């Protein structure tokens, strides 16, 4: 029975290194579908099986909305550390680390370009920058963008994706809620449209200010929208919240939103809204000099 002792070597690959690059596939956190990266990008980071909306970066958001190229403004503004704040690490160090990892100076990008052939001012928030939190720079850039829109008679689109006011900047961050809201009031008096797009998540001081002040408040499907998070609310009231509470569909049903729109249809919806409220085009770039 010597043949029992015969051991054959396993078949070896001619190339022992894997030929499949890392990061080529993405697993959907909702349905566990494995999606090819290029297919996901082609669908604007929406799952091709269950329509789960992955988060977009600010740059990806601008690419999904503008017709082509755009001009970014106030690129040099960056946060300082006025309170010398320290939690688990100094705020100054946290800023340095985040700037290095994201390649951005703060949590919002403001730009002008065209949507559906019309000049528009767009602000897109970046969640990977300290949770998209709103500090002095975010408030200043959005306010300048709104003022530019008023000067050049252009509509405004703000895409929110934020955990709220930035606690490391204390009352200075809370002031931005009033500052942006006041700028939007001036935009309203100028009879220029403001479209607010709420994405997952939009919470805290951002929800309590400019995110809910749009002439049209549009949310992406299943986006978490609220002031305090559901876990905090449950711990405070000691009750279980209803199914889907603080999700965009729940808010639409209860009159807090105008519509819930799939990301793949968002640009067309915004284009139609802008057509209804369009004004004649004004000459000149939407650039505003720094205020003292």
What does each of the following model-derived ranges do?
Residues 106-110, 119, 154-155, 192:
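Short glycine-rich loop/turn motifs
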Residues 1-104, 112-115, 273-292:
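Intrinsically disordered, low-complexity segments enriched in small/flexible residues
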Residues 38, 125, 159, 197-198:
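Structural motif
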């Amino acid at each position: 029975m010597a043949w029992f002792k015969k051991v054959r070597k396993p078949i070896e690959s001619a190339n022992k290194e894997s030929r499949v690059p890392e990061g080529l596939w993405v697993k959907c956190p909702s349905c566990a579908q494995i999606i090819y990266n290029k297919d996901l990008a082609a669908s604007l980071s929406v799952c091709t099986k269950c329509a789960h909306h992955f988060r977009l970066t600010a740059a990806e958001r601008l690419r999904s909305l503008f017709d082509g190229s755009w001009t970014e403004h106030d690129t040099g503004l960056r946060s300082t550390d006025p309170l010398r704040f320290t939690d688990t690490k100094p705020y100054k160090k946290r800023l340095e680390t985040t700037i290095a990892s994201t390649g951005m100076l703060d949590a919002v990008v403001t730009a002008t370009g065209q949507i559906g052939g019309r000049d528009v001012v767009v602000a897109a928030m970046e969640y990977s920058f300290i949770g998209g939190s709103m500090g002095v720079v975010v408030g200043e850039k959005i306010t300048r963008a709104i003022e530019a829109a008023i000067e050049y008679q252009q509509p405004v689109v703000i895409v929110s994706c934020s955990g709220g006011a930035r606690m490391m900047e204390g009352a200075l961050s809370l002031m931005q809620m009033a500052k942006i809201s006041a700028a939007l009031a001036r935009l309203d008096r100028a009879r220029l449209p403001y479209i607010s797009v709420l994405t997952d998540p939009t919470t805290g001081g951002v929800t309590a200010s400019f995110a809910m002040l749009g002439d049209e408040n549009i949310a992406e499907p299943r986006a978490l929208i609220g002031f305090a998070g559901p876990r905090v609310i449950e711990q405070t009231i000691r009750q279980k919240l209803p199914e889907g509470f603080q999700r965009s569909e729940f808010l639409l049903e209860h009159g807090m939103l105008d519509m819930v729109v799939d990301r793949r249809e968002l640009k067309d919806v915004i284009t139609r809204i802008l057509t209804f409220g369009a004004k004649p085009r004004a000459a000149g770039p939407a650039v505003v000099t720094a205020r003292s």
